[in-house]
C-alpha cells in the first residue's frame, strides 16, 4: 500500500440519504406444563444478547458514492450517511468524521504539514460552528459525551474536551501505528494497521486486551461497537469484516469478498437502529440491518486462546 494505506486523494465531501427502520421485538413467552398436571408454570424466556455466534447481517442498501479514498463514515439522524473524503476543498488531508449527538453536529479531522484541526459542523445549517487547531495531524476519532477521543499521526491517543477545548494525553508514550478508535461505555478500542492488532483500553489508557487474529484479520482499519460490546472491524488486506466478543475470547468473520465486498476501509454501527454502514476502497457503501439469527455453520467461529 502507498501513502500510509495506499489511498489516493480526492477533493470532495458528500452526504447520502436512506430510510431508517427500527425494529422492536418483545421477549418470548413459553408455557411449561408439569407432568402431574397439578399446576402450570409460565416462564419468560429472556432474549439472549447479540453475540459473536448469533450476529446476522442483512443487506438493506448499496450506495455508489462515486468517490474513492473515503476515510470516514457516520450514520446520522433521519437516515443520513456522512462520508469523509481524503482531501477537503483547501487541499488539506481529511481523515475521519463522527456524530456529536449533544448539539446535532459532526466533527471532521483534517490537517497537513504536521498540523491538524477538528472542525465542528452544524448538521441543520451545514455551517462551521468552530475549528480547533491541533499541534499534530489526526487520524480516527470517537465521541463520548462532551469528549472527542482521537489517534494522532505521531501514534498517540488523546482526548479533547469540547467545553473548554483542552487536550489531554490518554496514552502519552508512542504507540505504533494507531489508526481508528471507537468507544463504548468506559472502554476505548483502537486499530493498528501496521501490527494487525485491535487493542481495548480503559479511559485512562490501561490496556484491557489485545486481539491479533492473523488468520482472519489483516490490515485492520475502521472500528465500531454495538450495544452489547461486540467489536466490528474492517480488514483492508484480509478483505472482510470481523466481529470480536467483548471478552476477546471469540471472533467471527461476518463479511468477506464473497459478499460482493472488496477492501473495506471504514464502518459505523448505529446503536439506535442496529444498522451497520461499511464503505470500501472503491467508494461503495453497504448498509446492513444487524439482527440476532441462528448461528451459521458456514461461518467459522474462532475461539481465542
PLM segments and residue spans:
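Protein-protein interaction scaffold domains that mediate dimerization/oligomerization
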Residues: 1-60, 74-76, 179, 249, ...
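Blade-level signature of beta-propeller repeat domains, shared across WD40, Kelch, NHL, RCC1
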Residues: 262-305
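Loop/turn-rich, solvent-exposed surfaces of beta-rich toroidal or solenoidal domains
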Residues: 191, 195-200, 208-246
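A short beta-strand motif characteristic of beta-propeller blades
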Residues: 58-64, 83-90, 126-133, 165-173, ...
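Structural signal for beta-propeller blades
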Residues: 115-118, 156-158, 196-198, 239-242, ...
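Beta-rich, blade/repeat-based domains predominating
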Residues: 67-76, 90-105, 134-152, 173-194, ...
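Short loop/turn segments that connect beta-strands within beta-propeller blades
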Residues: 122-126, 161-165, 202-206, 245-249, ...
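Short loop/turn segments immediately following the C-termini of beta-strands
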Residues: 111-113, 153-154, 193, 236, ...
Amino acid at each position: 500500500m502507498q501513502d500510509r494505506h495506499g489511498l489516493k486523494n480526492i477533493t470532495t465531501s458528500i452526504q447520502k440519504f436512506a430510510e431508517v427502520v427500527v425494529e422492536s421485538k418483545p421477549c418470548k413467552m413459553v408455557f411449561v406444563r408439569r407432568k402431574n398436571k397439578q399446576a402450570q408454570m409460565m416462564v419468560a424466556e429472556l432474549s439472549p444478547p447479540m453475540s459473536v455466534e448469533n450476529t446476522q447481517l442483512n443487506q438493506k442498501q448499496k450506495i455508489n458514492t462515486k468517490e474513492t479514498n473515503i476515510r470516514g463514515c457516520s450514520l446520522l439522524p433521519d437516515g443520513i450517511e456522512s462520508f469523509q473524503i481524503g482531501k477537503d476543498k483547501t487541499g488539506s488531508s481529511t481523515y475521519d468524521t463522527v456524530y456529536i449527538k449533544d448539539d446535532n453536529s459532526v466533527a471532521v479531522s483534517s490537517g497537513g504539514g504536521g498540523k491538524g484541526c477538528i472542525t465542528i459542523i452544524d448538521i441543520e445549517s451545514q455551517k462551521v460552528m468552530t475549528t480547533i487547531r491541533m499541534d499534530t495531524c489526526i487520524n480516527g476519532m470517537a465521541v463520548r459525551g462532551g469528549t472527542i477521543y482521537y489517534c494522532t499521526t505521531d501514534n498517540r491517543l488523546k482526548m479533547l474536551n469540547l467545553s473548554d477545548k483542552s487536550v489531554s494525553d490518554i496514552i502519552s508514550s508512542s504507540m505504533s501505528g494507531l489508526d481508528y478508535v471507537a468507544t463504548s461505555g468506559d472502554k476505548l478500542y483502537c486499530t493498528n494497521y501496521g501490527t494487525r492488532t485491535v487493542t481495548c483500553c480503559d479511559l485512562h489508557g490501561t490496556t484491557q486486551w489485545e486481539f491479533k487474529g492473523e488468520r482472519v484479520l489483516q490490515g485492520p482499519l475502521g472500528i465500531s461497537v454495538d450495544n452489547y460490546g461486540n467489536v466490528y472491524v474492517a480488514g483492508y488486506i484480509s478483505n472482510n469484516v470481523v466481529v470480536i466478543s467483548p471478552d476477546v475470547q471469540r471472533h467471527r468473520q461476518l463479511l468477506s469478498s464473497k459478499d460482493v465486498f472488496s477492501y473495506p476501509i471504514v464502518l459505523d454501527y448505529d446503536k439506535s437502529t442496529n444498522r451497520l454502514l461499511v464503505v470500501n476502497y472503491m467508494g461503495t457503501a453497504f448498509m446492513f440491518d444487524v439482527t440476532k439469527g441462528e448461528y451459521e455453520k458456514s461461518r467459522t467461529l474462532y475461539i481465542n486462546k
